[in-house]
Amino acid sequence: MIEPNLGAPLDIHRATVLPAWIDWNGHMNVGYYVVAFDKATDTLCRQFNVGWEYTRDKIGMTFVLEVHVTYEREVKEGDPLRITTQILDHDAKRVHYIHMMYHATEGYLAATNEIMLMNIDFASRRSAPWPEFALVPLTKLAGAHKGLPLPKQAGRIIGIKKK
């Protein structure tokens, strides 16, 4: 586990835009943004002890309930990515967070991914409270992020505004 700065969004995930991720428009295809964000979710889950080992050891797993992606600016093959994560809320079974994808060297915001993740009991495959070993670090992280400004992309809905 990386020791994060708890008073700021987690800055613990890096990636590079792979050639296979490029579409006919010459930029990263929309689906691969979600792939990159999913890898960042894996990194996040390890921060509160519910990574791959959690499922491998048949304790539990996490399921994504809902996602919302915004595309701010394109990235291209070979571009380095920096993905930060901010916890927006959590309860006994869920965590609500947002990933922010930046071009790692130019610094611009490329995309965001807001997610609701739920803890699942391995045996029953039903929702279950976070185990203590996950809830303690998750609560600490959420508390540290509570005072952070809410990103403007968080909580958005999709629709065409009527004039």
Regions of interest found by a model, annotated:
Residues A8, Y108-A110:
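Beta-strand initiation motifs
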Residues M1-V64, M118-K163:
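Hot-dog-fold acyl-thioester-processing enzymes
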Residues A111-N113, P129:
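A structural microfeature
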